[in-house]
Amino acid sequence: MKKRVAGWYRRMKIKDKLFVFLSLIMAVSFLFVYSGVQYAFHVYDEQIYRKSSEVLRMSSERIEDELKKIEDVSYEIITDEQIQRILSMQNRDDTYDQYQMKQELWDQLAGYASDEKYIDSIHVIDARGSEYSAGSSSSDLLQQEQEEVFKRAKAKSGRNLWMTLGGSDPVLISARQIRSYHQLSLNGLGMVLIQVNVKQMIRDVPKDWGDSVGDIMIADQGGNLVYTAHASAHVPEAAKETLKHPGYDLIKKNGKRYFISYLQSSYQNWSYYNVIPFDQMFAKISFMKTVIGTCFLLFFCVVLLFGRKIANSITEPIEQLVTAMKSVQHSGIEAGVSLSLPEHTQDEAGMLNRHFTVMMKRINELMEENVEKQLIIKETELKALQAQINPHFLYNTLESINWLAKANQQKQISKMVESLGFLLRNSIHMKKDIVTIQEEADIVRHYMTIQRFRFEERLKFTLDIDDEVKHCLIPKLTLQPLAENAIQYALEPFTRPCAIRIQAKKAKGCVCITVEDNGPGMDGRILESTGGRGIGLWNIRERISLTFGEPYGLRIHSEHEKGTRIVITIPCRNEVV
């Protein structure tokens, strides 16, 4: 399978590879971005869940604070000295006094009712069953269930009792038995009932907490609803089944999803529920998820479209170049020269086309030049063959003179002819640029032999070559021009004798060659030129540097009336590197 995929990938065109590569990058990027967004939304959801639970806790605390205030009001009522006195005197028959006491009691209750915002009404019922009430509204349920309330409140012996009356629309009341504290008799004087406006209380609690507050529901220890909003009255049972411990969860009821946070308060052991429709709480988040996913998919498609176009723009010049190469392969160089490739782009593809066009033109020019050069070479070789007739004729003539001189016992003439023949043969047959020091010394020796016959006793020549450097390499015609310069500048212009000495030895791992004379000494600038007679010192220095490198070369030491000394330094090598 791996080989098949690798083979399929190798057969793909570059533009397809670029497109696949870009698609993979975008897909991986999409997965990373999607995972990151999902994680971010998950963290955000958790924050919302925690905030909702925190809001429920704060709401419950505020509600319980208000309920405790109402408890305090009921306690103040049952311990109010004037109310105690009025209720204790209800057994009198004085009608005027009773009327006056009723007025005082109503005034007292009205004052207490106005102290707290969430008290709907206050009811005081004396021992004879007479009722005194104050407040904005009163529920008929108090009349209907008065006996049950009395019974349960009496069992509390003056402690506060919270009760809910009714079913679907419950009424919350605070009930206390009023007991006489005169002489600590604790006789029953009546009952105080306070009806609480729970709706307004809960409506005021979450004003500044936004979408984290939904429908708050409260259930007492027995599971009876203390308060519920009409829209979500059907949720508590499902909530109680799902939320066994304080926290939050998502539940589904009647085809709708709800987010519910739950806690149980230590105060009265009441349970608080914050019920939020899922769509209300997470509508914005769901919308953002949809928008982000849609935008990324659109971006993905746009990038792929542009990526395809960019891949085509990159590979199109290359494909045209491949077509041109195939045309050259089948039709020859002329087809490549006549092709017109697009060169308007400045990128590497455009450079390839431009360079290919230039290369085809250059190859065509070189081929044409090569044809011309081959013709010239053929002509030159023919002329060279013709020109070689003269040197060979001269060499053969010199050999004839040499044998004739030997036959007539002319040894000096024979030596001159032999040396001249050696030099002529060396110039004809030796095609090497690098020779051994021994071979170079032989050239100098024969050259100086000829010069001795010319200058006789005036020329004294010494050649001293150590055996360990004889096979070291040196550029051809290095020593002979130096000997020629010495004769030219130290011997020819004067009539006095001149000693020329050439020495070669090994020193510090290198070969040191010295050419010195005892002439009058010359300016180095004069020695640098050849005067049209041979190879200059500058040329020798350059050839040594090019052959062996910069550390090696030639140095000149010349003093007036003391002579000239030229030192050559080359590496001790037996073969060319």
From Swiss-Prot:
Residues 1-17, 308-577 are cytoplasmic. One of its GO terms (molecular function) is phosphorelay sensor kinase activity. Member of the two-component regulatory system YesM/YesN. Probably activates YesN by phosphorylation. PANTHER family: SENSOR HISTIDINE KINASE YPDA (PTHR34220:SF7). This is Sensor histidine kinase YesM. Its EC number is 2.7.13.3. It is found in: Cell membrane. It is a multi-pass membrane protein. PROSITE patterns: HAMP (PS50885), HIS_KIN (PS50109). Residues 39-286 are extracellular. It catalyses: ATP + protein L-histidine = ADP + protein N-phospho-L-histidine.
